[in-house]
A protein has these predicted regions:
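An active-site-proximal "capping" alpha-helix that borders the catalytic cofactor pocket
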Residues: 14-28
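Active-site-proximal substrate-binding core of FAD-dependent oxidoreductases
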Residues: 24-63
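Flexible, glycine/charged-enriched surface loops at secondary-structure junctions
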Residues: 30-37, 93-94, 128-131
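Local cysteine-cluster metal-coordination motifs and their immediate loop/turn environment
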Residues: 66-80, 98-117
Length: 152
């Protein structure tokens, strides 16, 4: 397992897995190289790295980029929603954290984590109590407060 997590050997394993997948698939059907395949996936735009003009254009196009959720890392609601829409994202607090960094700043999520939970719940169309930190065994909330609300 440690070898698979090594950054230095990652490319070797990716190639071996790809070659093995081709051999397995070729047993069942013809396999051909796709000449139009682009191995580079465009990343999620990073608001804090944009100049003022680019930032203004993103906000004009998508107002969610103007709503800062994580003040420490300058992460917008738009970036979090883009992470949730990504093919690579796990819709958990840690999944979003690994993709766009809310909760990685000096407050360690003390300010933004409740907002991230709300955004995930809204995006998935589930109650706050259904949002998980990292897995099905890691709930964020356990039930309603005395007022009857589940708060994140």
């Amino acid at each position: 397992r440690d070898c698979l997590l090594s950054r230095g050997l990652g490319d070797v394993y990716k190639r071996q897995v790809a070659d093995m997948a081709v051999r397995i698939l070729a047993r069942e059907r013809p396999v051909a190289i796709n000449p139009d395949f682009d191995p580079h996936r465009p990343g999620i735009p990073v608001l804090r790295e944009m100049d003022d003009a680019t930032r203004a254009a993103y906000i004009a196009k998508n107002p969610d980029y103007g709503a800062i959720v994580c003040r420490c890392e300058e992460i917008s609601r738009g970036e979090i929603l883009d992470a949730l829409r990504s093919n690579v994202c796990v819709p958990t607090v840690d999944g979003v954290k690994k993709r766009v960094r809310p909760g990685m700043g000096r407050c360690q999520g003390g300010f933004c984590s409740p907002q991230v939970v709300r955004i995930i719940a809204e995006y998935l169309g589930v109650p706050l109590s259904a949002v998980r930190k990292s897995s099905a065994d890691a709930p964020i909330t356990f039930g309603p407060t005395k007022s009857g609300e589940v708060q994140a």
